[in-house]
């Protein structure tokens, strides 16, 4: 139950971001470096995703027989096709910003170090024109909060059944991440 409660709290955060917090604004994510799992899902919940060239993206959950449960399928489908969504979610490899741009998953790739300026440029010059189009995108392909809730319930049920080998692998990956920070 605790896992489900925490998962639903994460869903609330990405859903509110996707819905622009109920305000007339555009949410933008800037990706610098590796963007994996839940971090990638959080970025995808923005209306606009800008990445620096060296950024890499992926869903490593498949390595431990899980799938990303915080909206990956829902958000990728609203940017691309079911085929691309399934390819991304079932592949543990990291993909470059350029590859993500080609697949239609992100909106803009800029040189390393130019991300903050690109976000400012977008907000100053392109956002006023794009706001209406982004609203149309949400209308044509709406996201119902229940969709995210149902997926997180499936994720929790799946996570509760993972085996010891997968738990050990997760532990090793967490330990390696901790060494990086």
Language model features with spans:
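C-terminal alpha-helix plus adjacent terminal tail
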Residues: 113, 121-181
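Active-site-proximal alpha-helical scaffold in enzymes
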Residues: 40-41
């Amino acid at each position: 139950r605790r896992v489900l409660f925490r998962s639903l709290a994460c869903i609330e955060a990405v859903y509110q971001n996707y819905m622009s917090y109920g305000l007339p604004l555009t949410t933008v994510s800037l990706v610098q470096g590796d963007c994996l799992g839940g971090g990638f899902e959080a970025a995808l919940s923005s209306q606009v995703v800008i990445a620096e060239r060296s950024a890499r993206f992926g869903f490593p959950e498949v390595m431990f027989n899980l799938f990303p449960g915080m909206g990956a399928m829902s958000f990728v489908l609203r940017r691309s096709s079911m085929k691309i969504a399934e390819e991304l979610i079932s592949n543990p490899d990291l993909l470059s910003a350029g590859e993500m741009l080609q697949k239609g998953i992100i909106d803009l790739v800029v040189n390393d170090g130019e991300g903050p300026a690109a976000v400012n440029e977008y907000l100053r010059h392109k956002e006023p024109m794009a706001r209406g189009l982004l609203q149309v995108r949400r209308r044509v392909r709406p996201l119902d909060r229940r969709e995210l809730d149902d997926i997180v319930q499936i994720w929790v049920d799946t996570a509760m059944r993972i085996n010891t080998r997968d738990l050990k692998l997760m532990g090793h990956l967490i330990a390696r991440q901790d060494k990086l920070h």
